Structures are given as structure tokens and as C-alpha cells.
């Protein structure tokens, strides 16, 4: 059997909730590893039985995380995306990807 893809969730608002529920219920071959970001991260992590990381840095340091979903407010995504990419993790960034074309270009 192939290994399951470990997913980290950054963001605990409506879209963080939606994406995490989708990963848990509908993404075959993937599992939620941890959640960080936002005032509801702890509650959302508890709901899914995963840890709530204290920071993006703590999350991306986890070797069991292969990919990260970024579901944060638009203005936060550039810095987060750069940290996740620097850690060598795959990314799914919510739309709009960035607030400017220059930021989006940096993210690529």
C-alpha cells in the first residue's frame, strides 16, 4: 500500500474548516497531520484529532507533512508561502493567491 500524503492546514476560518473537512472525508491517500493559524486552530485541530502547531515554522519542521494548504487572509499569504516553500513542502494556496501581481510572482 502506498504511503498516505501528510497535509498541514494553515488557517482556521471558514475555508480552513472547509479544506480540513474535505481532506479528512474525501481525499483518498491523504491525511491531516496538524493545523496552525487563527484563533480557532486549537478547536479545529481537536475536532480532527490532530495537534495544533504554535507556528508555521513548527508545522513545516514536521517531517510527516508533505504538503500544506494555505487558507489565510489574502495579505498574509506571501510570507507564509515563502516559509512553506523554503521548507520544501508542496503548497495549495487559496485564491486570490496574492494581493498584487508582484507578490504572486514572488510566490512562484
Which stretches of residues belong to each language-model region?
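N-terminal Rossmann-like dinucleotide-binding module
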Residues: 1-47
Amino acid at each position: 500500500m502506498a504511503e498516505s500524503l501528510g497535509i498541514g492546514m494553515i488557517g482556521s476560518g471558514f475555508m480552513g474548516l472547509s479544506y480540513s473537512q474535505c481532506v479528512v472525508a474525501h481525499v483518498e491517500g491523504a491525511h491531516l497531520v496538524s493545523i496552525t493559524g487563527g484563533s480557532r486552530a486549537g478547536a479545529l485541530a481537536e475536532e480532527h484529532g490532530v495537534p495544533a502547531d504554535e507556528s508555521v515554522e513548527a508545522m513545516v519542521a514536521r517531517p510527516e507533512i508533505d504538503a500544506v494548504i494555505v487558507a489565510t487572509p489574502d495579505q498574509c499569504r506571501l510570507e507564509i508561502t515563502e516559509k512553506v516553500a523554503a521548507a520544501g513542502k508542496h503548497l495549495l494556496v487559496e485564491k486570490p493567491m496574492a494581493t498584487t501581481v508582484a507578490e504572486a510572482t514572488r510566490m512562484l
